Structures are given as structure tokens and as C-alpha cells.
UniProtKB/Swiss-Prot annotation:
Protein species of origin: Orientia tsutsugamushi (strain Ikeda)
Keyword rRNA-binding carried by entry: no
Protein name, as recorded: Chaperone protein DnaJ
Zinc finger (CR-type): 138-216
Lineage of the species this protein comes from: Bacteria, Pseudomonadati, Pseudomonadota, Alphaproteobacteria, Rickettsiales
Keywords: Chaperone, Cytoplasm, DNA replication, Metal-binding, Repeat, Stress response, Zinc, Zinc-finger
InterPro entries linked to this entry: DnaJ, DnaJ_C, DnaJ_domain, HSP40/DnaJ_pept-bd, HSP_DnaJ_Cys-rich_dom, HSP_DnaJ_Cys-rich_dom_sf, J_dom_sf
Function as written in the Swiss-Prot or TrEMBL entry: Participates actively in the response to hyperosmotic and heat shock by preventing the aggregation of stress-denatured proteins and by disaggregating proteins, also in an autonomous, DnaK-independent fashion. Unfolded proteins bind initially to DnaJ; upon interaction with the DnaJ-bound protein, DnaK hydrolyzes its bound ATP, resulting in the formation of a stable complex. GrpE releases ADP from DnaK; ATP binding to DnaK triggers the release of the substrate protein, thus completing the reaction cycle.
HAMAP family: DnaJ (MF_01152)
Every J domain range: 5-70
Amino acid sequence: MSELDYYQVLGVSRTASQEEIKRAYRKLVLKYHPDHNPGDKNAEQKIKNINEAYDILKDEKKRSAYDQLGHQTFKNSGGGNYQQHHGFTGGIDPNDIFENIFGDFMGARRSSKTAFSKKAGANLKYDISLTLEEAFYGVTKIISFKTALTCEACTGKGSLDNNSTSSCPTCRGSGVTRSQQGFFFFENTCQTCRGAGHVIKNPCTKCYGEGRYINTRNLEVKIPAGVKEGSRIKLTGEGEAGSRGGKTGDLYVCITLIPHNTFSVDGNDLHCQLDINCTTAALGGEVEVTDITGSKLKLKIPAGTQNNHKLKLSGKGMQILHSDRCGNMIVHVNIKVPKSLTKSQRELMIKLDKELNEASEEGFLSKVRNFWTSGSE
């Protein structure tokens, strides 16, 4: 049987980054998981090959050894060379050789092997888009996503009874296997028990001993009033389920605000544009504006208001998170000049322009006279 090319198994290049390897692994696991391919022996074999390849390539030391020496690096039969050149005659397990040399170290390793039997679930991130009104009032959303869920059949233990584990026959309870190439020893996570040091004699038929399985989850998320663009809501214990009773990860819901037709957001303030005519700007007056709640508000325009002037409506802005207060509503004034005039309107504008210019000239001449008069006294 030909040996697997671990890079081909995961569908990545030999220069792939760890992130690319991890992404490829997750994609393949979802595709060939037994829950999605019940009774498919080919899918079962592919999952085994995928796990084997990922176990080597995810570890930089193992990957480097594999790149240099290939599969021979991870074969226990490699110990034959060591025995032949040093007078050993059969029956010698590379594990025994390794433990004789590094016994104290491995003793410490064995004492912590239970850490491998439980694996914490990963934290998850979910992006959600809200309208500005939803962010203002707060909203409850139902989100749907694929993740690892705790197996109900075995309550996450991975076994169908409470006493179904035994020492792993491959690594003899150490959680690791050792191989030797020439004078070099290599240590790898045991493929049989995946580092746990024990195997399940009566594995759960639903999760295949994992204590979890992949499925779609629907979750109700309550989003508080006042969230902003980029706000992140942490839902403790709502992430990926742990393996064989491991701690469940957390879920982070990340907020994106959909652009609004009227308002833009700056901190807790809402900004909007208001068009007024030139006579209202000159004479002043009162106009009506609509806030984020849809309420109509009266806004006073001071006489002599200039273009791009900003007017503030206090407390009419965005809801402040975890507070009963609101920011301000900032109204930006745009003075609109008429594009066409009737004959009478044009005559009035010419008359007004003449009077304004005369008033301006009189004001200037008056200032000159006053200057010279005061200077001669």
C-alpha cells in the first residue's frame, strides 16, 4: 500500500501556512464527517487519513521531520537499525529505549496525560448586521450556525457507560509513541488514543467516542440598546462544545450597522442634513425635523444662519449602551438657492440686492467720515 502524502490529503501546498492547513482540515472534516456520510466506509477512511495528516502538519517539529525524512520518521520499525548496530536482539520496543533514556521526563509527561483526554471547545465569532433603529432600541435575533454540539446520547463522555475506558494498547497509557531514525528519537501523539493514554471500549455510536458532533445550531441572541459599529457581545459557554467533557467555548457576536438613509453616527450623536431656503436663513423661523424614533420635532432657525451651520437637539441622539440617556442630534443646515425665478421674484431680488449694497456702502462711508472727524478734533 502506497504511503499517504499528507499535503495532498489536506489539499494544501508544501509551503502552506498553519492557518491554511487548519482551514483545509476543518473544511474536510465537515465534508467527510460520519454524521454527514452514514455508513460510507470511504468517508470513514478519509477521516482517518485527514486526522493522521493534520496531526503531523499542525506541529512544526513533526512537519519539519516529515519534510526531511518522510514517513520513515514515524515508523516504529525504524528501531531495527538501532538494534542491529548496537547488539540488541528483537523484542525491544522503541518506547522502552526512549523511556530508559528519558525516564524522568516521561514520568512527568504521564502525570499530565489526563489533560489530553478532555479538549476545550473553540471560541466562535458570528457577524450580524443591524439597522440603526434596531441598534437604538435593542433587538432579539435568532442566529443559525454550524458548530460542534455536546452529544446527548452519551452526555459528552464519548462512551455509552461510565467504565468503558482502558489503557491504550499502542502507547501503553503514555499518550505518545516514539520512533527512532539512526541516532535520533522522535515523539508523536498517539494516533490510536490521540494523546489521551486510554481508549474507549464501548464508544458512543452517535459521536464515535468524541463526545460531540457537528450540526446546525439555532440560538436566540438578545442585543441591548445602544450597540455601535464594531460592538462585540460575549456569550459565555455558547461556543463550540468541548471533546469528551471538555469546557465549552464562548461565542462572540460582532455588530455591523447598515447605513441609514437619514442619519450617520458619531459616537453617541446622530447627524442629519436639513435644507432651508435663503429667506428662512436670513429672517429666521421654525422648521420641523424627524428624529430616529420617527417623532416630529420643532427646530428654531436663528436669523442670519449661514450655510453648513450646525444646530443641536440635546438628548435626541443614539441610545447610550447600558444607560437611560441618549446622545445629541446634530442638524447640518444647507441653504438652497432657487434655480429659477419668476419675473416679479427677480425684480424683488434685484431691489433687495441694491438695498443691501447701498447699506453696505453707507456703512463703509460712515466709518470713513467718523475716522477723519474723530482724528481732526
